[in-house]
């Protein structure tokens, strides 16, 4: 949301509750988050971005579907707005994604590459969890969780990976994966889209 606002988009958001540090971060950037209500979409926005925590029955999701509003999931938006033409470095695995992605972004930053990054936390040494620059380098924390109720692929398959770091794999997310083998299949789909000139680092 903050990165899109910096690009000149008008942004509004809805959630059940946002708490520090994220609420503080959004408030400092003038981004208002409201409780879910169909009135939030009455002005017919150009695009509705539906998060993966949203399921059928959510009033705003139902409104978007019923009124044929353009919608997409966040990973798809990232791909089209921020990742095309970049060297996407995707850090994934069951544990250690945030730490490893933060370290990788910091290394690129301190080597003068001014990377874009999207990390599932706010690293102390970077001051924010997301930043999109004109640099050709982008570090993404890649999550194997599903993209949205209308797209059950793992989020990381949208990230146009050029290099992938897999920290580790264990059985996780029992709400969407039935076994470790299913998780491994999801990671194999990510590996399958690394280009021939790309890189895979697997622990």
Identify the meaning behind each predicted range.
Residues 1-22, 26-33, 44-48, 66-69, ...:
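ATP-dependent carboxylate-amine ligase
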Residues 3, 27, 52, 56-202:
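Phosphate-binding loop of NTP-binding sites
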Residues 16-19, 37-39, 52-56, 76:
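Short, polar loop motifs at secondary-structure junctions
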Residues 35-38, 184:
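Structural motif corresponding to alpha-helix initiation and N-cap regions
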Residues 37-44, 155-157:
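Short amphipathic alpha-helix with an adjacent loop that forms part of the alpha/beta core around
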């Amino acid at each position: 949301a903050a990165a899109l606002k910096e690009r000149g988009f008008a942004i509004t958001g809805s959630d059940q509750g946002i708490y520090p540090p994220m609420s503080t971060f959004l408030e400092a950037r003038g981004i208002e988050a409201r409780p879910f209500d169909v009135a939030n979409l009455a002005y017919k926005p150009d695009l509705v971005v539906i998060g993966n925590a949203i399921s059928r029955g959510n009033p705003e999701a139902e409104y978007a579907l019923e009124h044929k509003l353009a919608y997409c999931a966040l990973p798809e938006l990232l791909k089209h707005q921020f990742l095309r033409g970049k060297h996407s470095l995707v850090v994934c695995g069951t544990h250690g994604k945030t730490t490893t992605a933060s370290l990788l972004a910091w290394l690129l930053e301190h080597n003068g590459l001014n990377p874009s990054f999207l990390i599932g936390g706010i690293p102390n040494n970077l001051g924010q969890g997301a930043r999109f620059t004109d640099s050709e380098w982008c570090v993404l924390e890649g999550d194997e969780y599903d993209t949205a109720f209308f797209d059950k692929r793992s989020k990381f398959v949208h990230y146009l990976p050029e290099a992938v770091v897999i920290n580790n794999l264990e059985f996780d997310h029992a709400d969407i994966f039935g076994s470790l083998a299913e998780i491994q299949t999801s990671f194999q789909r990510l590996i399958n889209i690394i280009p021939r000139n790309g890189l895979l680092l697997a622990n």
